[in-house]
Each structure stands twice: as C-alpha cells, then as structure tokens.
UniProtKB/Swiss-Prot annotation:
It is a multi-pass membrane protein. It comes from Bacillus subtilis (strain 168). It holds the Pfam family MFS_1. The growth-defect caused by the iolF inactivation was only observed in the iolT-null background. SUPFAM superfamilies: MFS general substrate transporter. This is Minor myo-inositol transporter IolF. Keywords: Cell membrane, Membrane, Transmembrane, Transmembrane helix, Transport. The keyword DNA repair does not apply. It is found in: Cell membrane. GO terms for cellular component: membrane; plasma membrane. One of its GO terms (molecular function) is transmembrane transporter activity. It comes from the Bacteria.
Length: 438
C-alpha cells in the first residue's frame, strides 16, 4: 500500500514501528548482560537461572507473545497491538527495576518477552503495509538498523555502567523503559495500517454481507496455498537462525576459545559484529534490495558460508575473528534476516499477514531454545570445528533454498502480490478461507 507520508524510509510511521527491533535487541542483550549480577544478588539456583533463560525475550515468552500478537493484529488491528504492547512492556521493565525476589524478576522477564513478541509481529506488518511498493525493502531495513542499534547501545551502556554492578544493569533497563514510553507516545498519534483499514471498512459498510475475511485462524495457515510459503520461509529463516542463535549467545565464548582473547575483547568483538550488521543493512540492503533483491540475498547469504568456513581452517587468532565479524555482520544485515522480514510481510494476504509472522516467529524462537540445549554439549564433546561444520551446513542450505524459491515481489504492491499468489479476495472466499475464530 502506498505511504502517504512520502517515500523516505525515515518517516514517523516507519521509525515508530521500527523501534520494536531496538527494544527487542536491547531486552535480549540487557537480560544476558545482567544475568550474573542477578544470580549473585538473589542467590539463584541453576533451575532458576534456566527458567530465566528459557522464558526470556529470546525464547519461549517472546515466541508465545508473537503467536498471540500476530492473531490479535489481524483480528483487532495492528495499531491496537503495537501501541498497547508498549504499556505491557513498561510493566515488565518496572518489575525488573524494582524486583527484590525471584518471582518478581521472572515475571518481569516473561512480561517483557510476551510484549516484545507481540510488538515485533504487528510492527513488521505495519511497516510493510505502509511502505511504498518501490521502496519496501528500504522501509523494512529501518527495523533492522534499529535492531543493530539496540544491541550496540545496550552493550556500550553495559560496559560504561559495569562498575555500578546491579544498579548499572538497572540503568540499562531504565533506558529501555524511556524508549518504550517515547515509542508509545509516537504510536498513539499515528493512524492504523492502510491495508488493514481497507480490508475491514468495506465489510463494516456492507452489513448484509458476512465479514468472512475477518474470521481468521492459525489452522487456515495449514492450507496448501499458505503452507508452502511458510515452509519456504522456515527453510530460509529458521535454518539460518540455528546459526544465528549460536552466534548471539555463545559467540563471546567461541571468540575466547578460537582467538584466545579476553572476555572484554570478546564483548568488543560482539559489539563490532552488531556495528557491521547495521552497516550491512544501511549500505547494502536498503539501497539495493528493492531493485536487485535476489542478488543482494545471494551475496549476503554467501558471506555466512565464508564466515563459518573460517573456523574450519587450520588457522586461529584475532585476524580470523576480525574477518568473521565483518562477513557475518554483512550477512546479518543484508541476508536472511532482512529478506525474511520483507518476504514474510509480502507473500501472505492482509487477513493472515500478522498471524503468519507470529506463527513463524514462534517456531523460530522455540527451535532456537531447543537447539541451544545441545550446543554446549556439542562444543564440549566434539569441538568448535564440528559445531562450525554443522552451522556451515545450515547457512548453506538456507542460501540455496532462498535462491531457488525466492518469490518475485520487487516493485509490486501488496495487493498485486496477493492476487498473483492467491487470486482476488473474493476467490479466496470461494476457495474456503472462511473459518471460525481460533
């Protein structure tokens, strides 16, 4: 749908929605950075630590939030979800800031995760629906820049406030609370998604016709015409995320093992990785993906193949790590992550767009959580080389699937893409897309 605010990707509607990614990345990094401090303060057991990790914004709570948020965004509107999610998020942050026991801390982590998951699905959807058809990649790229910025800022704040102990980590979370409240103020003043309004207004105006398209269910997404799109996107994104999940949580450890660097240097390398991610989005994906999408995807996806191959070479040390963060940063910025956001917003009809993204986000985060249980065992028993070989297979498979089956959607409106893939909305009804609410 065309954007009445102009073609600039950095307009209020896009930035307000893109801040979801800043908050997502910031929550994950802040939670990870402060974990050891909370363990010391509350004398947490291994079971309690495991619960915090499993139910954090990087795992189960975010997955469940995405599932709920996706359904609600299709049912009641994108704005209702992505606006109110900020208030829920603020509640979760306050529980962390004022937490004096484990139940308060765990509740805060869960609420943060639920709100982040719901926010991501609604925000990604509204960005694509409000973007001009010729510049959709540029607009979606703003969200990926925000993700990298969130990670870098939180890492930097964590380093600067490190000497303050737990208070320093609370300052980091407090900064996220401020961002969330600013985001809420921005969003409450903005209109609903054009595409969602267009879909629903005619149905309300024609009372004699049943509002069949408004009755959505996750079971509808199991129909062959939608399932094949989900399988394609999971082949690209979920498989790639098996590597990305390891990179996000275990890379500082791998840096120390392969490069022999200190813990502080490992954190600096991780910050460098996020910086190159932002550069990959801003300098490669945003300027070129609207016109040369498959080429951009292929080159950026191949960067991940190069990156994980480096750990199979008989060479170790800091130079290998520096080359790794450059090529993986480019991949993170212009490869599977950014293209997934774009494709997932394009290839589903309006009435299922957010639900489909919620379902896939759920599957990805749950899969990462399960996979992460086995990663330490593989590294300990078989070595980093074996893990690198497995992840090399994942990113290679993801690249091949993307190159073979990527849809031709560049420069087309969402309505045109929907009609090419599924026919007109009327024909969808005739095919039996009407269903009961989940």
């Amino acid at each position: 749908m065309g954007n009445t605010n102009g073609d600039s990707a950095f307009n209020k509607r896009t930035i307000a929605a893109a801040l979801a990614n800043y908050i997502d990345a910031g929550s994950i990094v802040a939670g990870s950075a402060g974990l050891s401090l909370w363990v010391s303060y509350l004398k947490l057991s291994d079971t309690q630590i495991g619960l915090l990790g499993a139910l954090s914004a990087n795992a189960i709570s975010a997955a469940v939030g995405a599932l709920l948020g996706g359904f609600l965004a299709d049912k009641v509107g994108r704005k209702a979800v992505y606006t109110n999610s900020m208030l829920v998020y603020a509640l979760g942050i306050c529980l962390v800031l004022f937490g004096v026991n484990f139940p308060m801390l765990l509740s805060g982590y869960i609420i943060i995760g639920l709100s982040v998951g719901a926010d991501i699905t609604a925000s990604w959807t509204i960005i694509a629906e409000n973007a001009p058809k010729k510049n959709r990649a540029r607009h979606c790229g703003v969200a990926q820049v925000a993700w990298a910025a969130g990670a870098v800022v939180v890492l930097l704040l964590s380093v600067l406030a490190g000497d303050l102990g737990l208070l320093g980590n609370k300052i980091v979370f407090a900064h996220l609370l401020v961002i969330a409240l600013i985001t809420y103020i921005l969003r409450i003043r903005l209109p609903e998604s054009d595409a969602w309004q267009t879909k629903n207004q005619p149905e309300e105006a024609q009372a004699e016709k049943p509002a069949v398209l408004n009755k959505t269910s996750y079971f509808d997404l199991l129909k062959p015409m939608y399932l094949k799109s989900i399988l394609f996107l999971m082949g690209v994104y979920l498989v790639w995320n098996l590597a990305a999940g390891v990179m996000g949580f275990f890379m500082p450890y791998i840096y120390q093992q392969v490069g022999g660097v200190s813990a502080n240097m490992a954190n600096l390398l991780q910050m460098g990785l996020f910086i190159f991610t932002g550069l990959g989005v801003a300098l490669i994906f945003m300027p070129f993906a609207d016109k040369y999408r498959k080429t951009v995807f292929g080159i950026a996806a191949f960067m991940a193949v190069i990156g994980w191959t480096l750990f199979l070479l008989p060479v170790e040390g800091l130079p290998i790590l520096l080359l790794f963060i450059v090529v993986i940063g480019i991949n993170n910025g212009a490869g599977q992550q950014a293209n997934y956001q774009l494709w997932a917003s394009e290839i589903f009809p309006t009435q299922y767009r957010a639900s489909a993204q919620g379902l896939m986000f759920f599957l990805v985060r749950i899969s990462i959580g399960i996979w992460s249980l086995f990663v330490p065992m593989i590294i300990t028993n078989f070595g980093i080389g074996t893990m690198a070989a497995i992840l090399l297979g994942c990113v290679t498979a993801s690249m091949i699937i993307g190159l073979l089956f990527a849809p031709n959607t560049s420069g087309k409106s969402l309505e045109q893409i929907q009609e090419e893939l599924y026919g007109s909305p009327q024909s969808q009804v005739k095919k039996g897309t009407e269903s009961k609410i989940m």
